[in-house]
Amino acid sequence: MTAATADLARQALVEIGSVAERLNAAAFERFAQAISGAKRIALHGLGREGLQMKGFAMRLFHLGLDAHVVGEMTLPPVGAGDLLVVSAGPGDLATVAALADIARKAGAKVAVVTAQPGSALARAADHVLHIPAQTMADDQGADDCGADDREGKTSVLPMGSLFEFAQMLVFELLVLRLRDLTGETAASMRARHTNLE
């Protein structure tokens, strides 16, 4: 690795850590409690955010929770007592909002992971986890990268990558909190991992 690439890696790690440090602890705990208290959890996201949501669904399954990915054929219907967790980093996405509306009408609660807590989708949600990171909507494509999106600087990472990397870290932190809430162990989680690989 060149010195320039190593410097970019350090900058990216600082940015991701900065996002995690700015999480609202109370909102994080409410989000964890909502997940642990749900009868069934359905998860949805688009693009690379969708990949993070699939990884999170897998970890929730490892915790023994009834977690499913929206769009998969094995997804049961949602209703009262269930939770739809959606990712909408840039804010209002029409397809995500439509799914949230369907879930709400069926009696399920809606939880939103976003960088835009003031969006209509977030305002209508039962739970919001604000990840304060650059998304595609914030990326101005500048070449002079900075580490603080609050000052209008562009992340060293392209497009929405800062949000996506921070999202994965936040989800793993939620898994650790949920492990405490559910009384699961590393061993019990490993025991639920597939043997077909």
For each of these PLM feature ranges, what is it?
Residues 42-168:
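Glycine-rich phosphate-binding loops that contact phosphosugars or nucleotide phosphates
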Residues 20-37:
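A short, well-structured juxtamembrane/interface segment
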Residues 1, 173, 179-197:
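A short, charged, Gly/Pro-tolerant segment at domain boundaries
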Residues 5, 9, 28-31, 53:
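Hydrophobic packing residues in well-ordered alpha-helices of helical domains and bundles
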Residues 1-21:
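Generic N-terminal amphipathic, Lys/Arg-enriched alpha-helix
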Residues 11, 18, 30, 165, ...:
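Alpha-helical scaffold segments in soluble metabolic enzymes
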